[in-house]
């Protein structure tokens, strides 16, 4: 039993609507921006935003700002997560299968857009990094926390591979993963002759065996 639990009445009221049930169903699976939700459900932005506001207001959704975008998802802990977990068997049937198919298409487009973006900026990566990080040296930060010897190290989202040689100083084997072919080509050239392998993949589906 949850201690000091507040009344669940606002939660039940919020879910007494088909659109909000559909929103919770898809956002329990994936964190999405407003634009992505609009594209997946085929509804107007004002309508979606109103329902999102109600769900965030009662705590059944959380929002996270990233630049110009706001992303929504269900809570990762606490009473609200426990409540939605108890309803999970019914939430699974709270919307058409087409919603999940549309969300999968939206996520594919997100990955493709990310890949196009990083392919485009790959040649100018060093300049962009200096503009963002200034004199900060990520390699020195890695050296400060990395053990003296490790069997395997991985850089997920390795970009052009600037940290891969640093990892190879102390790791017997190093793997760099990125979704951009242009970035991986730069990483491969940078690490020629080192015990480093580069692989194309998404963070959600890493090209690495468990364990």
Regions found by a protein language model. Give the residues of each.
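Alpha-helical residues within the helix-turn-helix
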Residues: 39, 56-57
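Short, hydrophobic-biased segments on the C-terminal half of alpha helices
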Residues: 52-53
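Class I SAM-dependent methyltransferase SAM/SAH-binding core
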Residues: 154, 159-205
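Amphipathic alpha-helical dimerization/coiled-coil segments
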Residues: 78-124
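Beta-hairpin "wing" of winged helix-turn-helix
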Residues: 57-66, 73
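N-terminal helix-turn-helix DNA-binding core of bacterial DNA-binding proteins
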Residues: 2-47, 68-78, 141
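Class I SAM-dependent methyltransferase Rossmann-like catalytic core
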Residues: 122-132
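Conserved alpha-helix/loop element of class I SAM-dependent methyltransferases that forms part
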Residues: 132-151
